[in-house]
Amino acid sequence: EWEPVQNGGSSYYMVPRIWA
């Protein structure tokens, strides 16, 4: 499962849930 992570401003990137 992938979830969005805030990357500074209004942008974001997707990362595997296992990283969190």
Swiss-Prot record:
GO molecular function, one term: serine-type endopeptidase inhibitor activity
Keywords: Antimicrobial, Fungicide, Protease inhibitor, Serine protease inhibitor
Species per Swiss-Prot/TrEMBL record: Cullen corylifolium (Malaysian scurfpea)
Gene Ontology BP annotations: defense response to fungus; killing of cells of another organism
Protein role: Inhibits soybean trypsin. Has antifungal activity against R.cerealis, A.brassicae and A.niger, and weak antifungal activity against F.oxysporum.
Family: Belongs to the protease inhibitor I3 (leguminous Kunitz-type inhibitor) family.
Coiled coil regions, renumbered to chain: none
Keyword set includes tRNA processing: no
Keyword Lipid metabolism: no
Name of the protein in question: Antifungal protein
Source species taxonomy: Eukaryota, Viridiplantae, Streptophyta, Embryophyta, Tracheophyta
Domain of life: Eukaryota
